[in-house]
Structure formats: structure tokens, C-alpha cells
Swiss-Prot record:
Disulphide-bridged cysteine pairs: none
Residue span(s) of domain YcgL: 1-84
Domain of life: Bacteria
Short name of one Pfam family: YcgL
Protein name (Swiss-Prot/TrEMBL): YcgL domain-containing protein VIBHAR_01387
Organism this protein belongs to: Vibrio campbellii (strain ATCC BAA-1116)
């Protein structure tokens, strides 16, 4: 299965996967407005491949069922909370 990947011009770290290059007909208009101008990244074959940030099987299922897949960046890590948790664990040992 081939898919084309586009980077958002408005939301950093946000990518849109679609099954056909430059065919955004299955993507809701409201999503396209929030996404901004799609900037082409690459076209790849998904079969037998792994992706760094997302499960390739979820991408394939979404492309088949919805006609697109939206990859959003993970939420920012709260380093202060992580530090507090580590300190609490050290005190408990």
C-alpha cells in the first residue's frame, strides 16, 4: 500500500497521510483549514515497513476506513513532575 505524507504549515510535528498523492477529497474541510497548506514530505510503501512515531497497521487501517491518517506530536513532557517523581522514589528507597 502506497501513501503520501504531508507536513502541516500551521502545526509543528503534525503530518497527514493520504492514499493518493494530492487527493485530499476524503479529508474533512475543517481539518484541512486547521492543518494549513499541506507541504509534501514523501510517498512511501507501507507494506513491510515500520514508522518512527506511529504504528503502521493503524495508519493502514485509517487510510482504508477513513481515507486519511493524522499524526499529531506527543504531548510535551513535564520535566518538573518527572523530577519530583524520581525524588519521591529515591526517598522511599
Amino acid at each position: 500500500m502506497l501513501c503520501s505524507i504531508y507536513k502541516s504549515s500551521r502545526k509543528e510535528g503534525t503530518y497527514l497521510y493520504i492514499p493518493k498523492k494530492d487527493d485530499f477529497s476524503q479529508v474533512p474541510d475543517t481539518l484541512m483549514q486547521m492543518f494549513g497548506k499541506p507541504m509534501p514530505v514523501m510517498t512511501i510503501k507501507l507494506d513491510g515497513r515500520t514508522l518512527a512515531q506511529v504504528d503502521v497497521e493503524k495508519v493502514k487501517a485509517s487510510l482504508i476506513n477513513d481515507g486519511f491518517f493524522l499524526q499529531v506530536p506527543p504531548p510535551p513532557e513535564n520535566l518538573l513532575e518527572k523530577y519530583k517523581e524520581q525524588k519521591a522514589q529515591q526517598k522511599g528507597e
